[in-house]
Amino acid sequence: MIGIPIKAYTQHVKYDPKCIETGPRIWNKITAKTYARAIMNAQHPTWGRNEWKALVKLWGKESAWDATADNPDSTAYGIAQILNTKKGTPAPLQIERGLAYIVHRYDKPSIAWAHHRKHGWY
């Protein structure tokens, strides 16, 4: 669960209608991971395999990589379980915002994952 204002980490990740799936693509665990890996490698080329593994574990624990995961105890929603995310937010946007949040708050996934292991949230 994430508790900082959305605008702090969505400032540079604006809604882009091109993110919405226009064809038969179904966002599932595999397509979400594939997209996240591509975005992570493009935006953070120095992050290696360990950072990817940490991200897989972190979001696996938070949502099982389910773009429709809904936390009944908070406003957290989606793959990254970001607070105040509207239901129906496209999976690519969830992933981009989740990575932006991790960079903003923790610098990289391994630190976010360590925090999650200690506190049960990130």
Question: Model regions: which residues?
Answer:
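Peptidoglycan cell-wall recognition and remodeling modules
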Residues: 26-122
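Cell-wall glycan-active module
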Residues: 1-38
